[in-house]
Amino acid sequence: MPWFIKTESFTKETLKLLPAQREEFISKHKDWVVNLKKLGKAISSGYLVNENKIPGGGGLLIVEAENFSAAKFLIEQDPMIVYGLVNWEMHQWIPVIGEFPTD
């Protein structure tokens, strides 16, 4: 099955939220990912950091899906997107060399 990658960054409005307010939505996102994993979906999600391990570079989600439409439908259910907290893009990833473990 093909792999799809969603990259995201907080909107300007999201960056204005207090950290506790952002964490509320991030927790909803984490719960969404955990529930998908429990349903057997191959998915991995995390955030990006700089060389000093300081977050702020955005997030990355990798998911296996039947096709582009199915992946987009699934990703559009991410609470970070539903609540309009991130700017995002999705692309199909075609691995050429190596293997990708999902856990």
Report the location of each language-model feature.
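Conserved, structured core segments of small domains
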Residues: 1-103
